[in-house]
């Protein structure tokens, strides 16, 4: 009897521990926009740090995600296979009582993911980013940002605060570089094969690991430390596209001893760094 009671008590304790355990990693499929908060138990809302969402989210869901980012523990957000749809509540109201809402499907708006994130992977289905000239959608510096898919153009101001790793998915074909001084600052960058040109001030850093094998054109100061400053790239090897035709003066400065592989191409000597 004592053995039976001991086993019963152990079973009850185990079930209680499981019942009240808080999850730090969650994957949620949200098929009904506006219902994301109902898909996550309250106890997990306080503890989740790593959240993956698929399905459909609207303004109400983004408002809830912002709450998890700013007032709870969420720091890793993966929306790669989610779809942002119009509707729902305003996800943010600023100090001037201006409401930020989602009015169009597959669109990222200003301050949408403003919070304490370290990792953000945006939906592949995004086709438009609508932010102010000097603001972006995540506000604060972030370690890792993954962006692109159906998006064709990317403003540099929308990615310049990614500090450690920036991955731009296949499909993005061009950068929009205004305003000056907002180039990419990430130390490790993956460019898609669909980007063929680096325009003026694409990168705002002096140390970067980036694949440039598919780049056919390097613009003036496309990699420089900061606007009028010139930085020395702290890399050992550069391998260029076989289709490289123009290498502009002051595209970037290399440290002494850097090895350059031109893949048997013969660049037109418009100008050399």
Task: Enumerate the predicted regions with their spans.
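Extracellular beta-strand-rich solenoid/capping regions of secreted or surface-exposed proteins
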Residues: 62-70, 89-114
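Leucine-rich repeat
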Residues: 39-44, 65-70, 109-113, 135-137, ...
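N-terminal targeting signals for Sec/Tat export/insertion, comprising classic cleavable signal peptides
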Residues: 34-52
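Boundary/junction segments of secreted and surface-exposed precursor proteins
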Residues: 20-40
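Bacterial Sec-dependent N-terminal signal peptides
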Residues: 1-24
């Amino acid at each position: 009897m004592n053995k039976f009671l001991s086993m019963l008590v152990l079973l009850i304790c185990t079930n209680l521990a499981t019942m009240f355990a808080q999850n730090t990693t969650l994957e949620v499929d949200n098929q009904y926009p506006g219902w994301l908060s109902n898909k996550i138990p309250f106890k997990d809302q306080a503890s989740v740090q790593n959240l993956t969402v698929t399905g459909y989210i609207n303004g109400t869901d983004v408002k809830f995600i912002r709450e998890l980012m700013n007032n709870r523990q969420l720091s890793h957000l993966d929306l790669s296979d989610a779809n942002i749809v119009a509707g729902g509540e305003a996800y943010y109201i600023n100090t001037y009582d201006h409401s930020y809402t989602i009015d169009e499907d597959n669109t990222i708006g200003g301050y949408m993911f403003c919070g304490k994130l370290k990792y953000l992977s945006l939906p592949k289905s995004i086709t438009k980013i609508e932010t102010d000239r000097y603001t972006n959608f995540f506000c604060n510096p972030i370690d890792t940002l993954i962006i692109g898919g159906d998006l064709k153009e990317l403003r540099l101001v929308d990615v310049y605060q990614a500090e450690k790793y920036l991955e731009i998915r296949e499909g993005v074909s061009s950068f929009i570089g205004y305003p000056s001084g907002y180039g990419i600052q990430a130390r490790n960058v993956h460019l898609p094969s669909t980007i063929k040109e680096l325009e003026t001030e694409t990168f705002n850093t002096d140390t970067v690991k980036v694949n440039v094998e598919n780049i056919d054109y390097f613009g003036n100061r496309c990699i420089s430390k900061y606007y009028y400053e010139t930085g020395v790239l702290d890399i050992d090897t550069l391998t260029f596209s076989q289709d490289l035709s123009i290498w502009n003066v002051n595209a970037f400065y290399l440290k002494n001893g850097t090895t350059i592989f031109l893949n048997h191409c013969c660049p037109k000597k418009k100008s050399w760094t």
